[in-house]
Amino acid sequence: SAARGRFEAALVAQSEVELGLPCDVRDYTDFYTSVHHATTIGKQFRPDNPLLPNYKWVPIGYHGRASSILPSGASFRRPRGQTKAPDAAVPALTACARLDYELELGMIVGQGNTLGDPVDMAQAEDHVFGIALFNDWSARDIQGWEYQPLGPFLSKNFASTLSPWIVTMEALAPFRSPFLRPAEDPHPLPYLDSAQNRAQGAIDIELEVWLQTAQMRKNGHAGERLSCANYKDAYW
């Protein structure tokens, strides 16, 4: 019909659309919630002491750079920074040779709080609109040299990619599960604990990372799975 023709003329194929960010990101904090990831990365830099003693007591995080958050699929320049080989006398300025991905979930905070006024754990989720996939790209060779003693800087400020799609907390309700820790580990301090969080603080969803190169796409190859995890295993 004529009406259908006008309707179809207004549609654009999803494969031809370049999606943007789902929200205006004013600020973001990156938390280190996977104890397995923290231990693995710690072994690279501190083989004898991979997991620092504060990890199981306080959520570890750092303030990221909101101005370099890009939508998933966006291109960005490979970062440059100082690196130092173990046998080198001085560091060198080079392009990153160990660019790494990080499978993360972005918690979209829609409601703020008054400066200096803490949010109680029991009301914390009232401030969360939903979640989206997030990739905090990391230059591991630059990070290994620059992170001492205050943590990463140029190795993590060049690009982070956020999915254009947000899944609301209401849609995640069927996937909620109890927040659990190993019996031998310490319980969170009272201000980091609540009955509601213990009852359904975890989200039971499977997460995967797949690699699909340009050549794979050209050949119709679906890609290769690099890693998988379940968000209910997050330590915080």
Regions found by a protein language model. Name each.
Residues 1-228:
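Active-site microenvironments in enzyme catalytic cores
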Residues 234-236:
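Extended C-terminal subregions enriched in glycine
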